[in-house]
Amino acid sequence: HFICQAQGETFMDTRVIYTQLLSSIQFPPFLAMEYIATQPVVESPEQAAYDAVHTCPDIARVRPGETVALTAGSREVYDIVGILRGVIRAVREQGGVPFIVPAMGSHGGATAEGQVRVLEHFGITEEALGVEIRSSMGTVLVGHTQDGYPVHLDRIANAADHIIPIGRVKPHTDFRGPV
């Protein structure tokens, strides 16, 4: 009785399989719940990003013609293209020359080209944003932690006059230990 036929095709009846597999398992009682987020809804992430940069006192440090590296990572961010557009608009209004640098460690096969492909997966392209994507796996040593560990920065971002980090902040899935 595992095999069924419909419209001339034979297939496994998954209901019977699940019933047999799960019949000896006792599940705890479940309660239907609904979670309602109390945080305000951002109607336009693009406008919110523009407003945040446009009203930030530090944007005044950007002088006409200076380069501004905007980071874009491999962690999914809702409407990341809109957010980047808002930041790009604010930087351009200040006279800055924005560009995108991938910020994702070994994702994309740890190659500059692979990281550009990861950004493309999220809709982050030169065509969509009207700015260059400058990708490199090269880094420069910018200092050391208090414990003596070296701190590296993307060499292209380091060469920019300014850097605006944009991305999702979350601990690495393999990180263990106190922060």
PLM region spans:
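Short, Lys/Arg-enriched N-terminal segments with co-localized hydrophobic residues
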Residues: 1-11
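An acidic, phosphate/nucleotide-engaging active-site surface
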Residues: 114-178
